């Protein structure tokens, strides 16, 4: 008999929570027939101030195959949580997962901007990205630098040397998921290398909590401003300096605006 799953869950608590969260979100999206245009990230929605999509797009998946591939790879990469003795571990995993979600999202929008503004490729203006692959590819890259002898197991059947996994998985994903976003995956790889080489570093509990706090604030206020969710207990008033919002609590409304109409140009990441 193999090792009971229970022990892996105990040793990979953060990974287990993320896999569960992404799976539940996928189920809700399917059950509620929520359109991916409502949760995905695109250049147009980013410049309109829908910053909350940077989080929802990362946690949402377009198909069960996409979900299974990402979660299978993520589960294997959860070995990072078991490597506290070499400077990794659960805290490191949580700290830099935050970094990967935010920085890879910002980077992919930056690349879209360059392609649109400099090279006049308007196709990328409306491409909508969804999926956790940016983070998955980022962790593949980090592990390939810090633990090059490790293996990446996919679906419990395929085992890849971690040193080549980011690029092998890039090819494999393109084959099984034709809509896979090359730029989204590349963004995760680049941020992963930046973390591995110390270009992005210094994360500790204080900075992680500070970053998480700002993520929550930006998420809530951008969600309110975009009108995607009716936080009627929050009201943003205009001041002389419009960059400094005033907040009032005036009621309690919870109205989710969701559409089942899909958006053309969806890319999975």
Swiss-Prot record:
Enzyme class, broadest EC rank: hydrolase
Active-site residue numbers: 133, 185
Keywords assigned: Hydrolase, Membrane, Protease, Transmembrane, Transmembrane helix
Entry GO MF terms: serine-type endopeptidase activity
One of the GO biological process terms: proteolysis
Recorded family membership: Belongs to the peptidase S54 family.
Function comment: Probable rhomboid-type serine protease that catalyzes intramembrane proteolysis.
Name used for this protein in its record: RHOMBOID-like protein 13
Gene name of the encoded protein: RBL13
């Amino acid at each position: 008999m193999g090792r009971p799953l229970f022990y892996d869950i105990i040793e990979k608590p953060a990974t287990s929570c993320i896999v569960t969260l992404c799976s539940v979100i996928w189920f809700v999206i399917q059950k509620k027939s929520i359109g991916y245009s409502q949760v995905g990230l695109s250049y147009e929605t980013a410049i309109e101030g829908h910053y909350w999509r940077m989080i929802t797009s990362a946690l949402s998946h377009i198909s069960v195959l996409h979900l299974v591939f990402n979660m299978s790879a993520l589960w294997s990469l959860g070995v990072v949580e078991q490597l506290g003795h070499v400077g990794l571990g659960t805290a490191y995993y949580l700290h830099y997962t935050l970094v990967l979600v935010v920085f890879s999202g910002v980077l992919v929008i930056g690349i879209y901007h360059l392609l649109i503004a400099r090279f006049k490729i308007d196709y990328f203006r409306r491409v909508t990205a969804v999926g956790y692959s940016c983070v998955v590819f980022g962790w593949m890259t980090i592990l390939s630098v810090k633990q090059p002898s490790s293996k990446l197991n996919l679906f419990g059947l395929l085992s890849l040397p971690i040193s080549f996994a980011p690029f092998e998985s890039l090819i494999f994903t393109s084959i099984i998921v034709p809509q896979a976003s090359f730029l989204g995956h590349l963004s995760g790889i680049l941020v992963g290398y930046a973390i591995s080489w110390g270009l992005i570093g210094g994360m500790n509990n204080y900075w992680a909590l500070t970053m998480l706090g700002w993520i929550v604030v930006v998420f809530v206020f951008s969600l309110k401003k975009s009108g995607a969710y009716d936080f009627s207990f929050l009201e943003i008033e205009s001041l002389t300096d419009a960059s400094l919002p005033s907040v009032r609590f005036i009621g309690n409304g919870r109205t989710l605006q969701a559409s089942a109409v899909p958006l053309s140009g969806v890319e999975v990441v």
